[in-house]
A protein has these predicted regions:
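Short glycine/threonine-rich loop-to-helix capping motif typified by GTGT followed
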Residues: 47-56, 85-102, 121-128, 160
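Conserved beta-strand-centric core segments of catalytic alpha/beta enzyme folds
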Residues: 1-25, 125-190
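Conserved catalytic cysteine-centered active-site region
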Residues: 1-11, 95-127
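Stable alpha-helical structural segments in soluble proteins, enriched in small hydrophobic residues
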Residues: 62-70, 97, 101, 133, ...
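Condensing-enzyme catalytic core mediating Claisen C-C bond formation in acyl metabolism
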Residues: 1-70, 78-79
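Conserved active-site and cofactor/substrate-binding residues in soluble primary-metabolism enzymes
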Residues: 10, 14, 18, 32, ...
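Beta-strand segments within the central parallel beta-sheet cores of soluble alpha/beta enzyme folds
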Residues: 32-40, 75-82, 109-116, 144-152
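Histidine-centered active-site/metal-ligand motif
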Residues: 25, 48, 83, 120, ...
Length: 190
């Protein structure tokens, strides 16, 4: 993802599961609480069956909806695991949406796409990428976007991408994006 010479995603296989439990119940039974689901957002831009809106309107709206649902300000977000499929249009649109929504703070957010390591897991992509975002909170390490060699001049180079090497970072608030064919978009915030 995000490399100038990217030309589409590689399929992968995987499955994942996140167990959600009411906070009071988890505390009462003495469970280890790894993180709290702060909010979620949905949007449907229906711009094109396989291409995002060029300005990333669906991506912008889903992240905005997620922040509003969580009651979290944009400047509180430390990390975003982007949908980042390595498609020429998708990476540009999502990056533009992040820059627009987060303003100057966008350049402080540690950004990655774990699809660079897992491939696109289709129906499992959202949950696996959410687990990776949770891992940044738990372990204080943001996994890299691997195989990045050449910057794309159409992607804002001021964005704080995690290219080729993991970065240690104290992450308190992490976001994960997942977008589907036909413009179905989802976002979660931990």
């Amino acid at each position: 993802p995000f490399d100038k010479d990217r030309d589409g995603f590689v399929l992968g296989e995987g499955a994942g599961c996140v167990i959600l439990e009411e906070y009071e119940h988890a505390v009462k039974r003495g469970a280890t609480i790894y993180a709290e689901l702060k909010g979620a957002g949905l949007s449907a831009d229906a711009y094109h069956m396989t291409a995002p809106h060029p300005e990333g309107l669906g991506a912008y709206l889903v992240m905005k909806n997620c922040l509003e649902d969580a009651g979290v300000q944009p400047n509180e977000v430390d990390h975003i695991n982007m949908h980042g499929t390595s498609t020429p249009l998708g990476d540009i649109a999502e990056s533009s949406a992040i820059a627009k929504l987060f303003g100057e703070h966008a350049y402080n957010i540690q950004i990655n796409s774990t699809k660079s390591m897992t491939g696109h897991l289709l129906g499992a992509a959202g949950v696996i990428e959410s687990i990776a975002a949770l891992g940044t909170i738990i372990h204080g390490v943001v996994p890299p976007t691997i195989n990045h060699f050449t910057d794309d001049e159409q992607i804002d180079s001021r964005l704080n991408f995690t290219f080729n090497e993991a970065v240690q970072r104290d992450v308190k608030v992490a976001m994960s994006n997942t977008f589907g064919f036909g413009g179905h978009n989802a976002c979660v915030l931990f």
